[in-house]
UniProtKB/Swiss-Prot annotation:
Transmembrane residue ranges: none
Signal peptide: none
Biased composition (Basic residues): 305-319
Record-linked Pfam families: Ku (PF02735)
Subunit text: Homodimer. Interacts with LigD.
Organism name: Streptomyces avermitilis (strain ATCC 31267 / DSM 46492 / JCM 5070 / NBRC 14893 / NCIMB 12804 / NRRL 8165 / MA-4680)
Gene3D superfamilies hit by this protein: 2.40.290.10
Stretches assigned to the Ku domain: 10-188
Protein name: Non-homologous end joining protein Ku
Assigned protein family: Belongs to the prokaryotic Ku family.
Keyword field: DNA damage, DNA recombination, DNA repair, DNA-binding
Amino acid sequence: MPRTIWSGAISFGLVTVPIHVVSATEDHSVRFHQYHLEDMGRVRVRKYCELEDREVTQDEIGKGYELSKDTVIPVLDEELRELPLPTAKAIEIEAFVPLASIDPMGIGEGYYLQPDGQVAAKPYKLLRQALERSSKVAVAKYAWSGRERLGMLRVREEAIVLHAMRWPDEIRDPSELAPQGIELSEDEITEAEQLIDRLTRDDLEGEEFQDHYTEALHEVIEAKQEGHAPPEARETEEEPGKVLDLMAALRQSVAKAKASRGESGEADVHELPRKKTAARKTAKQQPAKKTSAKRTAAKEPTKKTAAKKTTPKKPRRSA
């Protein structure tokens, strides 16, 4: 299992379940670094004090709230840890609700909750089975990374999953995005429903649900590593054009979906062809000799002062 992100407890009425929080997902994206193109030297970001114009270490860095342009209120990590919040040390379950009552827009990253030792095993299993039988999810509050957060607990196989959630006031109203003055015929809606039926799947298994972008990136990197030109873009069956007749486009889409199933009507539905952009050929570049550059002195800014006692201004919720 991955490393522990946070340790605490689930508070479930008078029941406490000690847990470890671990990541539930993995990122397989290809990661690039930034390089100076002239000599391929690695470009790095360093932390500088704008008043002293020098690089500072992590031990010299702390948090502060900018009250005004020239006044900063320092906030210590110890002060944040001692905030009088029950959620600072535990995931406090506030309510149980049907999953359908939660807007998916507010559901974020998922984490596995792992019982902390044999003592926590029984109450952990109790909560997991109770959630499963009730067909509900738990809504909880917890404090991470300098702010109180909303979370959702649900069952996934034999584990309890914590999903980070957004507060209701953090979700924007989409009403202004809806097109105005548009009318649809019943035939158009029926054709769209037929297309949905033809493209309906029981799961996300299949070649069309693989990460082809990452696969293509690996092909480019491997080709350049061997001194070859990057592979050419594969030819597509056709390129989609502008939709001039919505009804005709819907009928054509339904026909293609039917054809992709085969004569029996039971074959898998494949994704319609997408337009692909051709990869540019680039010559293999030899790294140049790394050279060091002198740092240019920065203009000395106006000095900020730490506030001693000022009229408090209510800060916004931190990110």
